[in-house]
A protein has these predicted regions:
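Conserved acidic donor-binding segment of nucleotide-sugar-dependent glycosyltransferases
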Residues: 278-289, 297-303
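Short hydrophobic beta-strand element within catalytic cores of glycosyltransferases
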Residues: 263-266
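Aromatic "clamp/platform" in nucleotide-sugar-dependent glycosyltransferases that forms part
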Residues: 246
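C-terminal alpha-helical cap of glycosyltransferases
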Residues: 3-13, 322-341
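Conserved catalytic-core segment of nucleotide-activated headgroup transferases in glycan assembly
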Residues: 158-222
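Donor nucleotide-sugar binding/catalytic pocket of nucleotide-sugar-dependent glycosyltransferases
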Residues: 127-167, 180-188
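Short alpha-helical segment that forms part of, or immediately flanks, the ligand-binding pocket
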Residues: 232, 251-259, 273-274, 280
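A short, well-ordered alpha-helix in the C-terminal region of glycosyltransferases
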Residues: 297, 304-319, 325-331
């Protein structure tokens, strides 16, 4: 075996205990889970880019923010993690003209059906050395079925998002929970994202029902929970959680509600039918009249709601647990480090 061949084999199998990963602020809750891999994450920022929002999650201790437009050449980065084809992957390739590192491309979103073929083709070609998707459904929609890729499902912190004892006749001190039987939805910018979150459908489905909306909204429709603990409380006080998304691979709020043991009713879109078995761990349909009827049935039958909620939490424990998430990502990170020259 030549020295060059031995060097290649050695590099492909080696790994570090802790990697230095250059990345971008994207989804706070997802990146909080990602930080549990134990590596160091450094967020690159430029003018106009998204910044970490503390309302959605506390910044982990191993997640650092770099000064704007700085990559600190003194830091020994191991690879770049891009989490979007809409700006981040382009920035990654631009930065890489200097750093020359492997790029891991994670895509959370789906291509919009109305895109012209040329636009889809251009975005489809914006790839990394390793391409990761959050569901098999996403792989198909992006046209990667026959190409090398990785799939890592979301994870939920089930020790935080869990059933808690609540007195639905009394609000905990210092909180603003809704006490009466009600339907909860957690969505940011609901109205302005009607095209994918389906606010108009939500209005029709929940007409004449008691509801509570949580989430940042520039129109003043709702406010975010003032803490993660408050959000967990909101999930536990809700009688039913309603998700009306039409164009989202898998809404994080839906998984969190299930983890809290809340009975869920949802549209049957994207990856959701792979998670929710109708009548077993929730209800799904794309018929608004059916969705409303399912909600009303659960409001009248708290025992049924409790049973579906318990089954929903079990689904999260089995399919969206932290151990699998962390192990899958560490395998990808080891693979990326093996590509470093």
């Amino acid at each position: 075996m030549s020295n060059q061949t031995a060097s290649i084999i050695s590099k492909s199998t080696c790994k570090k205990k802790t990697y230095n990963i250059l990345t971008f602020d994207t989804h706070e809750r997802y990146q909080t889970q990602l930080a549990k891999t134990g590596h160091n994450f450094y967020a690159f920022r430029s003018d106009g880019c998204k910044e970490w929002n503390q309302d959605y999650g506390k910044q982990p201790e191993n997640y650092y923010t770099l000064p704007k437009n700085s990559i600190y050449h003194g830091l020994d980065f191991d690879f770049i993690l891009s989490q979007s084809k809409f700006g981040q992957i382009q920035a990654s390739h631009q930065i890489n003209q200097v750093l020359k590192l492997p790029i891991v491309s994670l895509e959370h979103t789906l291509p919009i059906p109305s895109w012209p073929d040329e636009q889809f083709s251009q975005l489809r070609q914006m790839t990394g050395d390793i391409n990761v998707f959050i569901s098999k459904y996403s792989v198909g929609r992006w046209g990667f079925t026959g190409e090398s890729h990785e799939v890592v499902h979301h994870s939920v912190d089930t020790s935080l998002f869990k059933p808690i004892e609540v007195d639905k006749m009394k609000a905990p001190e210092g909180t603003c929970v809704t006490l009466n039987d009600h339907v909860l939805s957690v969505v940011n910018d609901f109205k302005s994202r009607d095209y994918c979150c389906n606010y108009s459908g939500w209005e029709r489905i929940t007409k004449d029902l008691n509801t509570k909306l949580v989430g940042s909204c520039s129109e003043g429709l709702s406010k975010p929970a003032h803490s993660i603990e408050q959000l967990v409380t909101d999930y536990n006080y809700a009688s039913v959680f309603l998700n009306t998304s039409t164009f989202s691979p898998i809404p994080t709020s839906l998984l969190e509600a299930m983890s809290c043991g809340c009975a869920v009713v949802s549209t049957a879109t994207c990856m959701i039918p792979e998670i929710i078995e109708d009548g077993v761990n929730g209800y799904i349909s794309n018929d608004e009249a059916v969705l409303k009827s399912q909600i009303q049935n659960l409001l009248k039958n708290p025992g049924l709601a409790k049973e579906l909620g318990e089954n929903a939490r079990q689904t999260i424990l089995e399919k969206f647990n932290e151990d699998s998430f962390v192990n899958n990502w560490n395998n990808i990170f080891n693979k990326a480090y093996g590509l470093k020259k």
